[in-house]
């Protein structure tokens, strides 16, 4: 005896499925989160994973670099570990928060971001100098903020806004370049006044690159390069640089002239990087790190810790991860249909590429010492916050203005 089959229905000539053939099971939370056009699907997860790994490496290196001196002083050996881990976690939260903001809204916030940054750069001169520099603002609880790190973000937003608005009227001309310089010069002047030469170099390179990428006429760029180059050549040695900064450049050109003085940092850095061999001594087992022979080894010279304790394999891994960050930022710039987004992504890519090159270069002796942290790795809350906010800006551009959604 045959069983009764489920009824089927015909509506306007179309046969609908029989009863019971539809699945009533809802999709999983993960499936819904990564569904097409969902927020998480629009994120660049390669970029997120890479910066997370870099931050984790940084936490471990900072811990290894600071533990010996803290133990010798009878202090908590995990102090810097806890701080850096906390700052990295807060940085990731900031990254995700910024990624949810449409980049067009970021453009409307540019005047406020720029103004707040200028006020912060002015406020540092009301504080006491640390190691001869007015670079930090003291906050309750023993925390400090370094406004010059956020000047990179303010500059990129300001230049992107200027060139986007000028592009609506045609190819950017002299007026647009002068407006861009009017945004860049105050930041450069205040940062140099601190003094923070490394940050000033980043700001200068980002400014020059964004002017070129904006589509400004070549004759204007050439004339500007001649004028700026001549001005720097005339006053650079006597007014722009402090005596110790000139000494750093001299020691870079003649590294063996004063190994016990101006050339000490560079010499010890090269020894530390080269002593690790292929695989390094292992975390917490570096004799040069433990002896604290390299000054500022948890900040500007964190790459020396990687060189000694992680060896060539570890350092090349860090370089590869930083390279991926730059490539992903450039990829976002190429695949963006909005000029403001293109300039934002390009500015961030140049920032990370140049700063990484200078930091690593000064530890291996191919660049002078300028006092720049290694992005995502060096110790410091302001630096990692600025780095993560920049990654959030990249995610925002990708989510809202990317031509492709892969």
Please report, for each region that a protein language model flagged, where it lies by residue.
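Hydrophobic alpha-helical segments of polytopic membrane proteins
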Residues: 111-112, 118, 174-192, 197-238, ...
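Loop-to-helix entry and N-terminal half of a specific, functionally important transmembrane alpha helix
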Residues: 332-370, 377
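Hydrophobic, glycine- and aromatic-enriched re-entrant/interface helices and adjoining loop segments
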Residues: 130-138, 144, 220-317, 337-341
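Membrane-helix boundary/helix-loop-helix interface segments in multi-pass membrane proteins
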Residues: 2-54, 60-195, 360-373, 379, ...
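Hydrophobic alpha-helical transmembrane segments
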Residues: 86-94, 309-327
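Transmembrane alpha-helix boundary/anchor motif
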Residues: 93, 101, 158, 240, ...
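Interfacial segments of transmembrane alpha-helices in multi-pass membrane proteins
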Residues: 101, 192-193, 211, 326-338
């Amino acid at each position: 005896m045959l069983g009764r089959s489920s009824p089927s229905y015909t509506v306007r000539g179309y046969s609908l499925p029989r009863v019971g053939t539809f699945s009533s099971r809802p999709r999983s939370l993960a499936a819904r989160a990564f569904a097409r056009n969902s927020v998480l699907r629009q994120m660049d997860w390669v970029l997120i994973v890479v910066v997370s790994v870099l931050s984790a490496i940084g936490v471990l290196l900072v811990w290894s670099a600071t533990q010996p001196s803290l133990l010798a002083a009878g202090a908590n050996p995990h102090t810097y570990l806890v701080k850096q881990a906390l700052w990295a976690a807060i940085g990731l939260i900031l990254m995700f928060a910024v990624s949810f903001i449409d980049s067009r809204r970021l453009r409307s916030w540019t005047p406020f971001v720029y103004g707040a940054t200028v006020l912060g750069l002015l406020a540092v001169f009301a504080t006491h100098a640390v190691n001869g520099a007015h670079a930090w603002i003291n906050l309750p609880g023993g925390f400090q903020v370094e406004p010059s790190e956020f000047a990179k973000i303010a500059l990129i937003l300001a230049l992107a806004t200027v060139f986007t608005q000028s592009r609506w009227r045609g190819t950017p001309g002299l007026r647009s370049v002068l407006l861009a310089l009017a945004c860049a010069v105050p930041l450069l002047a205040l940062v140099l006044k601190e003094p923070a030469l490394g940050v000033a170099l980043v700001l200068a390179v980002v400014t020059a690159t964004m002017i070129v990428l904006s589509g400004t006429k070549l004759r204007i760029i050439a004339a500007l390069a001649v004028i700026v180059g001549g001005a720097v050549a005339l006053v650079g040695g006597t007014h722009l640089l402090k005596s110790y900064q000139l000494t750093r450049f001299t020691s870079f050109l003649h590294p063996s002239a004063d190994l016990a003085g101006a050339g000490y940092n560079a010499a010890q850095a090269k020894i530390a990087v080269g002593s690790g061999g292929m695989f390094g001594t292992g975390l917490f087992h570096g004799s040069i790190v433990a002896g604290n022979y390299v000054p500022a080894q948890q900040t500007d010279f964190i790459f020396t810790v990687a060189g000694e304790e992680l060896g060539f394999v570890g350092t090349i891994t860090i370089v590869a991860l930083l390279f991926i960050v730059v490539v992903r930022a450039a990829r976002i710039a190429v695949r963006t249909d909005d000029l403001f987004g293109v300039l934002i992504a390009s500015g961030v890519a140049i920032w990370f590429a140049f700063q990484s090159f200078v930091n690593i270069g000064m530890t291996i002796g191919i660049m002078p010492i300028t006092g720049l942290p290694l992005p995502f790795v060096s110790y410091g809350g302001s630096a990692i916050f600025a780095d993560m906010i920049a990654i959030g800006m990249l995610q925002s551009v990708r989510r809202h203005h990317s031509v492709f959604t892969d």
